[in-house]
Amino acid sequence: MSTSAAKASAPSREAEFDVDLFVIGGGSGGIRAARVASGHGAKVMLAEEYRLGGTCVIRGCVPKKLFVYASRFSDTFDEAAEFGWRLSVPHFDWPSLVAAKDREITRLEGLYGTGQEGAGVEVVRSRAVLEDAHTVRLLEDGRRVRARTILIATGARPELPPFDGIELGITSDGVFDLKTFPRKLVIGGAGYIAMEFAGLFAALGSDVTVVCRGSNVLRGFDEDVRQAVAGSYTNRGIKLMFGDSIRRLERRDGDVGGGDHAGRIDVTTEQGGRLVADQVLLAFGRRPNTTSLGLTALGSRLGRTAQSLSTRAPARISRTSTPWVTCRTSST
Protein backbone atom coordinates (compact mmCIF):
# COMPACT_ATOMS: atom_id res chain seq x y z
CA MET A 1 0.00 0.00 0.00
CA SER A 2 1.31 3.44 -0.91
CA THR A 3 1.84 6.10 1.73
CA SER A 4 -1.04 8.17 0.35
CA ALA A 5 -3.35 5.16 0.44
CA ALA A 6 -2.38 4.43 4.04
CA LYS A 7 -3.14 8.01 5.04
CA ALA A 8 -6.48 7.86 3.26
CA SER A 9 -7.46 4.74 5.22
CA ALA A 10 -6.47 6.19 8.61
CA PRO A 11 -9.64 8.26 9.18
CA SER A 12 -11.86 5.23 8.64
CA ARG A 13 -9.78 3.29 11.15
CA GLU A 14 -10.16 6.06 13.73
CA ALA A 15 -13.90 6.22 13.04
CA GLU A 16 -14.26 2.67 14.35
CA PHE A 17 -14.08 4.00 17.91
CA ASP A 18 -16.16 6.60 19.71
CA VAL A 19 -13.54 7.03 22.45
CA ASP A 20 -9.94 6.07 23.04
CA LEU A 21 -10.56 4.90 26.60
CA PHE A 22 -13.76 3.78 28.30
CA VAL A 23 -13.51 3.45 32.08
CA ILE A 24 -16.07 1.34 33.96
CA GLY A 25 -16.14 2.55 37.56
CA GLY A 26 -15.82 6.00 39.12
CA GLY A 27 -13.74 5.14 42.16
CA SER A 28 -10.23 6.32 42.96
CA GLY A 29 -8.58 4.14 40.31
CA GLY A 30 -11.02 4.89 37.52
CA ILE A 31 -11.12 8.62 38.23
CA ARG A 32 -7.34 8.90 38.21
CA ALA A 33 -6.90 6.81 35.06
CA ALA A 34 -9.52 8.83 33.18
CA ARG A 35 -8.01 12.17 34.15
CA VAL A 36 -4.43 11.15 33.30
CA ALA A 37 -5.43 9.63 29.95
CA SER A 38 -7.40 12.72 29.02
CA GLY A 39 -4.44 14.87 29.98
CA HIS A 40 -2.36 12.99 27.42
CA GLY A 41 -4.86 13.78 24.69
CA ALA A 42 -7.10 10.71 24.78
CA LYS A 43 -10.84 10.97 24.34
CA VAL A 44 -12.22 9.41 27.53
CA MET A 45 -15.64 8.36 28.78
CA LEU A 46 -16.30 7.09 32.32
CA ALA A 47 -19.42 5.26 33.51
CA GLU A 48 -20.47 5.14 37.17
CA GLU A 49 -23.83 3.79 38.31
CA TYR A 50 -23.74 5.11 41.88
CA ARG A 51 -21.61 8.01 43.18
CA LEU A 52 -18.22 9.31 42.12
CA GLY A 53 -15.49 8.45 44.59
CA GLY A 54 -16.01 4.73 44.99
CA THR A 55 -15.42 2.75 48.15
CA CYS A 56 -12.71 5.00 49.56
CA VAL A 57 -14.64 8.27 49.42
CA ILE A 58 -18.24 7.12 49.77
CA ARG A 59 -18.17 4.15 52.15
CA GLY A 60 -14.58 3.39 53.09
CA CYS A 61 -11.45 5.35 53.96
CA VAL A 62 -12.92 8.85 54.22
CA PRO A 63 -15.99 8.18 56.38
CA LYS A 64 -13.98 5.72 58.46
CA LYS A 65 -11.35 8.35 59.22
CA LEU A 66 -14.06 10.85 60.19
CA PHE A 67 -15.59 8.30 62.56
CA VAL A 68 -12.21 7.43 64.05
CA TYR A 69 -11.53 11.13 64.62
CA ALA A 70 -14.88 11.49 66.39
CA SER A 71 -14.22 8.40 68.52
CA ARG A 72 -11.00 9.84 69.95
CA PHE A 73 -12.78 12.64 71.79
CA SER A 74 -13.95 10.24 74.50
CA ASP A 75 -10.35 9.74 75.65
CA THR A 76 -9.73 13.49 75.45
CA PHE A 77 -12.63 14.21 77.77
CA ASP A 78 -11.32 11.69 80.31
CA GLU A 79 -7.80 13.09 80.17
CA ALA A 80 -9.00 16.70 80.46
CA ALA A 81 -10.58 15.98 83.85
CA GLU A 82 -7.22 14.75 85.13
CA PHE A 83 -5.71 18.11 84.23
CA GLY A 84 -8.24 20.25 86.02
CA TRP A 85 -10.98 20.67 83.46
CA ARG A 86 -14.48 20.36 84.89
CA LEU A 87 -16.95 19.32 82.24
CA SER A 88 -20.53 18.17 82.37
CA VAL A 89 -21.01 14.57 81.25
CA PRO A 90 -20.36 14.55 77.47
CA HIS A 91 -23.22 13.30 75.32
CA PHE A 92 -22.54 11.69 71.94
CA ASP A 93 -25.14 12.30 69.21
CA TRP A 94 -24.92 9.71 66.43
CA PRO A 95 -27.18 11.49 63.88
CA SER A 96 -24.95 14.58 64.07
CA LEU A 97 -21.88 12.51 63.18
CA VAL A 98 -23.68 10.83 60.28
CA ALA A 99 -24.81 14.25 58.99
CA ALA A 100 -21.25 15.61 59.19
CA LYS A 101 -20.03 12.58 57.26
CA ASP A 102 -22.67 13.11 54.58
CA ARG A 103 -21.66 16.75 54.12
CA GLU A 104 -17.99 15.87 53.66
CA ILE A 105 -18.70 13.04 51.23
CA THR A 106 -20.98 15.27 49.15
CA ARG A 107 -18.26 17.93 49.05
CA LEU A 108 -15.61 15.45 47.91
CA GLU A 109 -17.91 13.89 45.32
CA GLY A 110 -18.50 17.35 43.88
CA LEU A 111 -14.76 17.91 43.61
CA TYR A 112 -14.34 14.62 41.75
CA GLY A 113 -17.05 15.62 39.27
CA THR A 114 -15.56 19.06 38.76
CA GLY A 115 -12.13 17.55 38.23
CA GLN A 116 -13.38 15.16 35.56
CA GLU A 117 -15.24 17.93 33.78
CA GLY A 118 -12.18 20.15 33.85
CA ALA A 119 -10.05 17.35 32.42
CA GLY A 120 -12.46 16.85 29.54
CA VAL A 121 -13.70 13.43 30.64
CA GLU A 122 -17.31 12.63 29.77
CA VAL A 123 -18.99 11.12 32.84
CA VAL A 124 -22.08 8.97 32.30
CA ARG A 125 -24.30 7.99 35.24
CA SER A 126 -25.12 4.44 34.23
CA ARG A 127 -24.13 0.84 34.72
CA ALA A 128 -21.99 -0.37 31.83
CA VAL A 129 -21.49 -3.92 30.55
CA LEU A 130 -19.19 -5.39 27.92
CA GLU A 131 -20.62 -6.69 24.65
CA ASP A 132 -17.33 -7.43 22.95
CA ALA A 133 -13.67 -6.50 23.33
CA HIS A 134 -14.32 -2.95 22.10
CA THR A 135 -18.02 -2.33 22.80
CA VAL A 136 -19.69 -1.19 26.01
CA ARG A 137 -23.46 -0.94 26.48
CA LEU A 138 -24.92 1.64 28.86
CA LEU A 139 -27.90 0.11 30.64
CA GLU A 140 -29.47 3.48 31.49
CA ASP A 141 -30.37 4.27 27.89
CA GLY A 142 -29.18 1.26 25.88
CA ARG A 143 -26.52 3.26 24.08
CA ARG A 144 -23.48 1.42 22.74
CA VAL A 145 -20.02 2.96 22.85
CA ARG A 146 -17.04 1.70 20.86
CA ALA A 147 -13.71 2.09 22.67
CA ARG A 148 -10.14 1.43 21.61
CA THR A 149 -9.32 0.34 25.18
CA ILE A 150 -11.61 -0.54 28.09
CA LEU A 151 -10.49 -0.20 31.70
CA ILE A 152 -12.41 -2.09 34.39
CA ALA A 153 -12.10 -0.28 37.72
CA THR A 154 -15.19 -1.53 39.51
CA GLY A 155 -13.71 -2.10 42.96
CA ALA A 156 -14.95 -4.72 45.39
CA ARG A 157 -17.93 -5.57 47.58
CA PRO A 158 -18.29 -7.36 50.94
CA GLU A 159 -17.97 -11.13 50.93
CA LEU A 160 -20.98 -12.82 52.57
CA PRO A 161 -20.80 -16.52 53.52
CA PRO A 162 -24.12 -18.38 53.63
CA PHE A 163 -25.81 -18.85 57.00
CA ASP A 164 -29.36 -18.55 58.30
CA GLY A 165 -30.58 -15.00 58.91
CA ILE A 166 -27.72 -13.31 57.10
CA GLU A 167 -30.15 -10.66 55.83
CA LEU A 168 -30.37 -9.32 59.40
CA GLY A 169 -26.70 -8.35 59.36
CA ILE A 170 -25.07 -5.27 57.90
CA THR A 171 -21.75 -4.78 56.10
CA SER A 172 -19.16 -2.03 55.98
CA ASP A 173 -21.03 -0.58 52.99
CA GLY A 174 -23.98 0.40 55.18
CA VAL A 175 -22.58 0.84 58.67
CA PHE A 176 -21.91 4.56 58.20
CA ASP A 177 -25.57 5.21 57.42
CA LEU A 178 -27.27 3.53 60.38
CA LYS A 179 -30.15 5.60 61.68
CA THR A 180 -29.62 4.57 65.30
CA PHE A 181 -26.43 3.97 67.26
CA PRO A 182 -25.86 0.28 68.14
CA ARG A 183 -25.36 0.02 71.90
CA LYS A 184 -24.55 -3.67 71.52
CA LEU A 185 -22.54 -4.61 68.44
CA VAL A 186 -21.44 -8.08 67.36
CA ILE A 187 -18.84 -8.28 64.60
CA GLY A 188 -18.26 -11.41 62.54
CA GLY A 189 -14.67 -11.59 61.30
CA ALA A 190 -11.38 -10.28 62.67
CA GLY A 191 -9.56 -8.78 59.69
CA TYR A 192 -8.51 -5.17 59.48
CA ILE A 193 -11.99 -3.92 58.54
CA ALA A 194 -13.60 -5.75 61.45
CA MET A 195 -10.98 -4.54 63.91
CA GLU A 196 -11.17 -0.93 62.76
CA PHE A 197 -14.91 -0.89 63.38
CA ALA A 198 -14.56 -2.71 66.69
CA GLY A 199 -12.18 -0.05 67.95
CA LEU A 200 -14.07 3.00 66.80
CA PHE A 201 -17.52 1.78 67.93
CA ALA A 202 -16.14 0.80 71.33
CA ALA A 203 -14.67 4.30 71.68
CA LEU A 204 -18.03 5.81 70.77
CA GLY A 205 -19.69 3.78 73.53
CA SER A 206 -20.79 0.47 72.02
CA ASP A 207 -20.50 -2.84 73.86
CA VAL A 208 -18.53 -4.74 71.20
CA THR A 209 -17.98 -8.48 70.73
CA VAL A 210 -15.79 -9.83 67.92
CA VAL A 211 -16.41 -13.42 66.79
CA CYS A 212 -13.14 -14.69 65.30
CA ARG A 213 -12.82 -18.04 63.53
CA GLY A 214 -9.06 -18.25 64.11
CA SER A 215 -6.90 -18.24 67.22
CA ASN A 216 -6.04 -14.54 66.93
CA VAL A 217 -7.09 -11.37 65.13
CA LEU A 218 -5.64 -9.93 61.90
CA ARG A 219 -4.62 -13.08 60.05
CA GLY A 220 -1.66 -12.37 57.79
CA PHE A 221 -0.23 -9.57 59.92
CA ASP A 222 3.01 -9.85 61.91
CA GLU A 223 2.51 -11.87 65.07
CA ASP A 224 3.66 -9.07 67.37
CA VAL A 225 1.10 -6.73 65.81
CA ARG A 226 -1.67 -9.31 66.23
CA GLN A 227 -0.82 -9.85 69.88
CA ALA A 228 -0.58 -6.12 70.58
CA VAL A 229 -3.95 -5.35 68.99
CA ALA A 230 -5.70 -8.26 70.72
CA GLY A 231 -4.26 -7.23 74.09
CA SER A 232 -5.11 -3.57 73.62
CA TYR A 233 -8.68 -4.33 72.58
CA THR A 234 -9.20 -6.69 75.51
CA ASN A 235 -7.96 -3.99 77.90
CA ARG A 236 -10.46 -1.58 76.39
CA GLY A 237 -13.33 -3.95 77.14
CA ILE A 238 -13.82 -5.38 73.66
CA LYS A 239 -14.72 -9.06 73.91
CA LEU A 240 -12.86 -11.41 71.55
CA MET A 241 -14.35 -14.87 70.93
CA PHE A 242 -11.65 -17.01 69.29
CA GLY A 243 -12.15 -20.33 67.50
CA ASP A 244 -15.79 -19.61 66.71
CA SER A 245 -17.98 -18.21 63.94
CA ILE A 246 -21.54 -17.03 63.46
CA ARG A 247 -24.00 -19.80 62.64
CA ARG A 248 -27.38 -18.08 62.71
CA LEU A 249 -29.06 -14.69 63.22
CA GLU A 250 -32.65 -14.42 64.44
CA ARG A 251 -34.91 -11.51 65.24
CA ARG A 252 -35.97 -11.57 68.88
CA ASP A 253 -39.63 -12.53 69.44
CA GLY A 254 -41.90 -9.50 69.15
CA ASP A 255 -39.12 -7.22 67.86
CA VAL A 256 -39.92 -6.10 64.32
CA GLY A 257 -36.84 -3.93 64.02
CA GLY A 258 -36.39 -0.88 61.85
CA GLY A 259 -35.49 0.06 58.30
CA ASP A 260 -31.77 -0.48 58.90
CA HIS A 261 -32.32 -3.75 60.83
CA ALA A 262 -32.25 -1.87 64.15
CA GLY A 263 -33.67 -4.01 66.93
CA ARG A 264 -32.51 -6.89 69.07
CA ILE A 265 -30.92 -9.80 67.21
CA ASP A 266 -30.11 -13.21 68.68
CA VAL A 267 -26.73 -14.47 67.49
CA THR A 268 -25.91 -18.18 67.65
CA THR A 269 -22.33 -19.32 67.05
CA GLU A 270 -20.97 -22.61 65.75
CA GLN A 271 -19.66 -23.47 69.23
CA GLY A 272 -23.09 -22.95 70.80
CA GLY A 273 -22.51 -19.42 72.04
CA ARG A 274 -25.48 -17.07 72.27
CA LEU A 275 -25.25 -13.30 72.04
CA VAL A 276 -27.75 -10.47 71.80
CA ALA A 277 -27.00 -7.47 69.59
CA ASP A 278 -28.57 -4.29 68.27
CA GLN A 279 -26.56 -4.74 65.08
CA VAL A 280 -24.41 -7.51 63.62
CA LEU A 281 -21.61 -6.31 61.37
CA LEU A 282 -20.42 -8.93 58.88
CA ALA A 283 -16.78 -8.31 57.92
CA PHE A 284 -15.55 -11.45 56.17
CA GLY A 285 -13.43 -9.79 53.49
CA ARG A 286 -14.24 -8.45 50.04
CA ARG A 287 -14.54 -9.81 46.52
CA PRO A 288 -14.12 -8.04 43.14
CA ASN A 289 -17.14 -6.50 41.40
CA THR A 290 -16.49 -8.41 38.19
CA THR A 291 -19.67 -10.46 37.89
CA SER A 292 -22.43 -9.33 35.50
CA LEU A 293 -19.99 -7.21 33.50
CA GLY A 294 -19.94 -9.52 30.50
CA LEU A 295 -16.36 -10.68 31.00
CA THR A 296 -17.09 -14.39 30.79
CA ALA A 297 -19.09 -13.92 27.59
CA LEU A 298 -15.93 -12.48 26.05
CA GLY A 299 -13.92 -15.47 27.16
CA SER A 300 -12.14 -13.72 30.02
CA ARG A 301 -11.37 -16.13 32.82
CA LEU A 302 -12.41 -15.38 36.39
CA GLY A 303 -10.83 -16.93 39.45
CA ARG A 304 -12.53 -18.61 42.39
CA THR A 305 -13.27 -15.26 44.06
CA ALA A 306 -14.35 -13.60 40.77
CA GLN A 307 -11.04 -11.86 40.19
CA SER A 308 -9.94 -11.51 36.59
CA LEU A 309 -7.09 -13.88 35.77
CA SER A 310 -4.47 -11.68 34.17
CA THR A 311 -0.91 -11.47 33.00
CA ARG A 312 1.66 -9.68 35.11
CA ALA A 313 2.04 -5.95 34.49
CA PRO A 314 3.50 -3.06 36.48
CA ALA A 315 1.72 -0.59 38.74
CA ARG A 316 -1.25 -2.82 39.54
CA ILE A 317 -2.59 -2.45 35.97
CA SER A 318 -3.15 -5.88 34.41
CA ARG A 319 -4.22 -7.25 31.06
CA THR A 320 -7.12 -9.65 31.29
CA SER A 321 -7.18 -12.80 29.19
CA THR A 322 -9.18 -10.72 26.68
CA PRO A 323 -7.02 -8.32 24.60
CA TRP A 324 -7.84 -4.59 24.93
CA VAL A 325 -9.68 -5.11 28.22
CA THR A 326 -7.63 -3.98 31.21
CA CYS A 327 -8.27 -4.23 34.95
CA ARG A 328 -7.04 -1.94 37.67
CA THR A 329 -6.33 -4.23 40.59
CA SER A 330 -6.20 -3.28 44.25
CA SER A 331 -4.30 -4.47 47.29
CA THR A 332 -7.36 -3.99 49.52
Named regions from a protein language model:
Residues 1-21, 39-42:
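Extreme N-terminal leader/targeting segments of oxidoreductases
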Residues 22, 38-56, 206-217:
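Glycine-rich FAD pyrophosphate-binding loop
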Residues 5, 61, 152-207, 239, ...:
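Glycine-rich dinucleotide-binding loop and its adjacent helix/turn
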Residues 65-100:
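Glycine-rich active-site loop/strand segments that organize a redox cofactor
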Residues 19-46, 194-203:
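N-terminal Rossmann-like FAD-binding beta1-loop-alpha1 element of flavoenzymes
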Residues 13-27, 181-191:
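Beta1/beta-strand and adjacent pyrophosphate-binding region of the FAD-binding site
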Residues 2-7, 88, 122-125, 129-138, ...:
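A Rossmann-like FAD-binding core segment of flavoenzymes
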Residues 35-36, 221-228, 324-332:
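A conserved FAD-binding loop/helix module that cradles the flavin
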